[in-house]
Amino acid sequence: MNAYSFLTRAAELWPSKVAVAARGESVTFGELLKRSEELKHALFETGIRPGMGLGLVAANGPEFLVGLFAGLASGAVVMPISENLRPQEVNRMLELVPLAGVLHEGSFSHDLPRSTETQRGRFSIAMRPREYHLKVAPGVPNAAVIRFTSGTTGSAKGVVLSHQTVFERTEASVEGLQLSQGDAVLWVLPMAYHFVVSILTYVRYGIAVVVPDGDSPEQLISSAQQHSPQMLYGAPAVVQSLINAPSGLSLPRSMRVVSTSSCLYPQHARTFEQRFGTSVEQLYGLFEVGLPLGSGLVSGGDGASVGRALPRYEVAILDPAGQSLPAGHMGSLAVRGPGMFDAYLAPYRPAADALLHGWFLTGDLAVQSYDGSITVKGREKSVINVAGNKVFPEEVEGVINSYPGIQASRVYGLEHTQSGEMVVAEAVPQQGASIDVTALATYLSEKLSRYKLPSALRLVDSIERTDSGKIRRVAQG
């Protein structure tokens, strides 16, 4: 069993159908197979063998798909690496995971001891010395891919999926996404972070990927009008960007707009719907699990509704003892279903040791309503404790972001001698907006309980985020 069969089958069934369109280039499933086959042979010639770790560095577009499928076809365990990671972040990954080589499009200047460097088409294959030519995840039979978690509140962890897991997960995700052969997705996320429930699923089921020429609202809308995709799939920042599109520009009414990767604040969803006449759906995904929740329209309130459990998945809200809580009670969000991850790397930890009676604890605190929908309150590790009261950064950020002229915000806690912790907030003004901090503080005092109010509030030019678009909650050393 190998996920490469997704491509061979797609090329057999739909050889002339477009698989991916990006930067003026459209590549069919047949062409994608041909290029992947050629690169597979090149990988074998340079020494890649089944079970070895293979890094993949490529931009969103055809070459990412070519590199991913060529690596899978060779039997390697593929680990996509974002082009936008800092050198120290990449070097840390290379320390933790003994990759045999890195397949890269363009330059790759990180600390990778090389024994050979081979150029093949648009790719270079940088091979490490022979002591790295070993099975990268020997505890996982038929390992397929590795991806590091985003590390929003701590160190990132390597997550391993087997080919069996990829088969199960893609089968479940296409049902949850409600897409079918011949559909197209306007893709506005980094492929290096989203490639199983999305990219591999799309290829398996004959769904085209459309990569816009850029991330400006004008470019996104132009791509949507040109390709008429059934779905736009992006992060909350994409929704915010489109809200600020010049007047007169519109999105296709038949196109679903899906937000994923982090919380979409309700006020942004409402503004988007007023602007375009289209509701925003949220999908809740985790690399350890897949897409367990979604298809819910973003609702009001102090949190973000991520809908209900998608087909084949179960969800529960657990107390500290691991017991299920009734509707209306806040606890730890737990999910389970097909395609659960196989293991963590560095240190190695099989999934069975990380799960609680088969449940994966997401790290989010949430409430389940009586109709089964889930409202995420915030990350357990991000909760700020102010004199015994719990403050969720996401709630405070939502109120700050509702203030006219605010583009984004970040809220976090700092130690305080009397209250234990205090709330600190940073806010990014929209371009051209003039924000009176005193007026903003007054606005917050009218919307929030006293203990939730920021003790320090300042305007900043930008908010630090992880490469997958999530707010970075911890200072990076």
Residue ranges and their predicted role:
Residues 15-16, 130-148, 155, 178-184:
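Conserved pre-ATP/AMP-binding loop-to-beta segment of ANL
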Residues 25, 41-85, 187-190, 390:
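Conserved AMP-binding/adenylate-forming
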Residues 28-30, 144-171:
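Conserved AMP-binding A3 loop
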Residues 33-38, 159-180, 188, 297, ...:
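Conserved structural elements of the adenylate-forming
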Residues 167-184, 191-231, 245:
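Conserved AMP-binding/adenylation subdomain of ANL enzymes
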Residues 230-234, 243-302, 314:
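Gly/Ser/Thr-rich phosphate-binding loop
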Residues 308-312, 323-353, 357, 389-391:
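Conserved ATP/PPi-binding loop(s) of AMP-dependent carboxylate-activating enzymes
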